[in-house]
Swiss-Prot record:
Protein name per UniProt: 1-(5-phosphoribosyl)-5-[(5-phosphoribosylamino)methylideneamino] imidazole-4-carboxamide isomerase
Organism, scientific name: Bacillus thuringiensis subsp. konkukian (strain 97-27)
HAMAP family the UniProt entry points to: HisA
Gene Ontology biological-process entries: L-histidine biosynthetic process; L-tryptophan biosynthetic process
Protein EC: 5.3.1.16
Pathway: Amino-acid biosynthesis; L-histidine biosynthesis; L-histidine from 5-phospho-alpha-D-ribose 1-diphosphate: step 4/9
InterPro entries: Aldolase_TIM, His_biosynth, HisA_bact_arch, Isoase_HisA-like, Isoase_HisA-like_bact, RibuloseP-bd_barrel
One GO CC term, this protein: cytoplasm
């Protein structure tokens, strides 16, 4: 199983939100580049970065920070948040990003998504963020009428190879991942799944590993030290 330490960017800083609420932010590190270096130092093999400002604005607003992170570490970096054009995708690849995560665009601009998948294949990941089972977009501010299962099936038909699934109600809560929704997703599509939201303990990670989930994104648990990065990397390596 792949472990993705998370860095959420807001106004150039590394923050964590509670259940996706922008008003409930906690600054975890004033210097996201330093945080990325720390994660790499403790053994991380890849990083997951979200441009929260970009997710709301519809364009990358932390590109310079993302570029600095890519230059500062030697591990692959995947980035999501506000990426809604091929130009934006190409710009991220040009500064060293390894994979790009499309969210809102996957729901509202299928032509762009299809072009991106055709051009970049497995380098394009789709992020599906769900609130009460329905897909949320534009920085989780809007909730659509499409279920996360239906969108995942559409993504599979288009040729998307990896999905990041987030249950918003679990995000930043340390309440454990939504196993039920993940199991349903596994039964519905044959795409690689990266679980995000609520992971609080080594036991949570083991449970996801036992389900053969491809990867897990860990944020608050690393910052709050309820999960030790070196330990979880060792555990998943042995499983």
């Amino acid at each position: 199983m792949e472990i993705f330490p998370a860095i959420d960017l807001k106004e150039g800083r590394c923050v964590r939100l509670y259940q996706g609420e922008f008003s409930k932010e906690t600054v975890m590190n004033e210097d996201p580049v330093a945080q990325a270096i720390i994660f790499e130092k403790f053994g991380a093999k890849r990083l997951h970065i979200v441009d929260l400002d970009g997710a709301v604005a519809g364009e990358s607003l932390n590109l310079s920070v993302i570029e600095r992170i890519c230059k500062a570490v030697r591990i692959p970096v995947q980035v999501g948040g506000g990426i809604r054009s091929l130009v934006a995708v190409e710009k991220l690849f040009s500064v060293g990003v390894d994979k790009v995560i499309l969210g809102t665009a996957a729901l509202y601009d299928k032509t762009f998504l299809e072009e991106a998948v055709l051009l970049y294949k497995e380098k394009i990941i789709v992020g599906i963020d769900a609130k009460n089972g329905f897909v949320a977009t534009r920085g989780w501010l809007d909730v659509s009428e499409i279920s996360y299962i239906d969108l995942a099936k559409q993504m599979e038909k288009i040729g998307v190879q990896t999905i990041v699934f987030t249950d918003i109600s679990k995000d930043g809560t340390l309440a454990g991942p939504n196993i039920e929704q993940l199991e349903l997703l596994q039964k519905s599509v044959a795409i690689r799944l990266i679980a995000s939201g609520g992971v609080a303990s080594i036991q949570d990670v083991k449970k996801l590993n036992d389900m053969n989930i491809y990867g897990v994104i860990i944020g608050k648990a690393l910052y709050e030290k309820t999960i030790d990065l070196e330990e979880v990397l060792e555990v998943t390596k042995l499983c």
